[in-house]
Regions:
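Short proline/glycine- and polar residue-rich coil/turn motifs
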Residues: 177, 227-230, 306-310
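Beta-strand-rich extracellular passenger or scaffold domains
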Residues: 59-63
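Residue-level detector of buried hydrophobic side-chain packing
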Residues: 80, 185, 210-211, 244, ...
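Self-processing/autoproteolytic domain segments and adjacent N-terminal interaction modules in large
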Residues: 1-37, 42-49, 54-56, 72-208, ...
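Proteolytic cleavage junctions
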Residues: 199-207, 213-273
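Beta-strand-rich interaction surfaces with strong enrichment in secreted/lumenal proteins
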Residues: 172-176, 235-236, 301, 326
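Short loop/turn motifs at secondary-structure boundaries
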Residues: 254-363
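Exposed aromatic-hydrophobic patches
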Residues: 186-188, 231-239, 312-319
Length: 363
């Protein structure tokens, strides 16, 4: 059988799709409503908009097929589980998830297609624990899953870089990317799931970073991070699939080469702050100083792998493989930077990542 939904379709029981469930015009909404467990199975389902309202506690929906959402998903009430049921929920390029909360989220992986920014409506064990990605330079497929589990059972928490004081031992996120394209990743902390040794330091500058488990060298790596206490989040740039979580840093030692970023840039030719100035007095300490700058949407506007050499400095103009026009002057505003460099530690070469804000004035 064939069913095309361009209107409002409400389903109150189990769904077994044995034919075509699709749409012609992007006007329809598929509503799943009830007070008992609803299974979603059979052939894949395509819908423009998606609405959940089921008062069943714990799991309200079990997704056993593939669900494609093209516009809006409204998580009004009811947890949708696909962690064990094996289904897939795909958000297409312009799709967005609304109202996710502890009573309504996806317990399992969520896939985002395209290049738009997105907040993943994910969680586990009755807690909504989102992750966010920025706008991308080109289309990608990125999947995110949250685990309310100690990562140490699989990824040794004692194997870590020296600047990492203590790793979140109650939760982690798995991020899988089809293409190794850089994106800004935002993770959140929550008093119900995040350990107190992290919560107690969220207002301390440079105390909370995102860390990544490097499967090749079997060690946790510091990926840096900029905290936002209004949103209970920390953000940094990533380009690898894998396991990420929060960590408390040795914040009194978090700048191993004493790199200083003067974050005001006013390229007006007066000789003061015409370019982004980065003080690297211990040049023998920091090597291969890589600098990336992103606008407020997470689009990369500048990149160099050897800042300061051969005139490679940020002067308010975009450069690199970007989605904004190359070598065009950027508008005034606040930008986000990520520095990465190599430095010597007792047992060999280490890599450090630092993040922060730049204030650009081109008026």
């Amino acid at each position: 059988s064939t069913f095309y939904n361009d209107g409002r379709t409400s389903l109150y029981g189990h769904i077994l799709n044995e034919g075509t469930f699709d749409f012609y015009n992007q006007t329809g909404v598929l509503r799943l409503v009830g007070n008992q467990l609803q299974d979603i199975s059979g052939q894949e389902i395509f819908t423009t908009n998606f609405y959940l309202e089921n008062s069943t506690s714990q799991v309200a929906f079990q997704l056993k097929t593939t669900l494609h959402i093209y516009r809006d998903a409204d998580f009004n009430l009811g947890i949708l589980e696909n962690r064990l049921s094996g289904g897939t929920i795909n958000f297409l390029d312009e799709a967005w998830a609304y109202q996710a909360n502890n009573l309504s989220f996806v317990d399992g992986p969520v896939v985002k297609f395209g290049d738009h920014n997105f907040i993943y409506p994910i969680g586990h064990q009755n807690y909504y624990r989102p992750a966010g990605i920025s706008m991308l330079a080109s289309e990608n497929i990125i999947e995110a899953t949250y685990f309310l589990e100690n990562p140490g059972g699989l990824y040794d928490l004692q194997q870590k870089e020296g600047l990492i004081e203590r790793i979140d031992d109650r939760e982690y996120w798995q991020i899988d990317m089809e293409n190794r394209e850089e994106t800004m990743l935002s993770l959140t902390w929550n008093s119900n799931t995040t350990p107190n040794y992290i919560l107690n330091q969220t207002s301390t500058a440079d105390a909370i970073h995102i860390v990544y488990w490097n499967p090749i060298i079997q060690r946790w790596e510091d990926k840096g991070g900029l905290t936002n206490t209004d949103e209970n989040s920390v953000t940094t740039a990533i380009k690898r699939s894998g396991i990420y979580t929060l960590a408390l840093m040795k914040y009194d030692e978090v700048n191993p080469c004493e790199i200083v970023v003067f974050n005001a840039v006013t390229p007006n030719g007066d000789g003061f702050n015409d370019v982004l100035e980065i003080s690297n007095e211990e040049a023998s300490c920091a090597r291969n100083l890589e600098v990336k700058i992103f606008n407020r949407w997470g689009v990369k506007v500048f990149e160099t792998d050897n800042y300061g050499a051969s005139g490679q400095v940020f002067d308010g103009y975009s450069s690199g493989r970007l989605t904004v026009q190359e070598q065009s002057q950027l508008p005034s505003g606040t930008y986000f930077y990520v520095l990465e460099y190599d430095y010597e530690q007792g047992d060999g070469l280490r890599k450090h990542q630092k993040a922060g804000y730049i204030h650009l004035s081109t008026d």
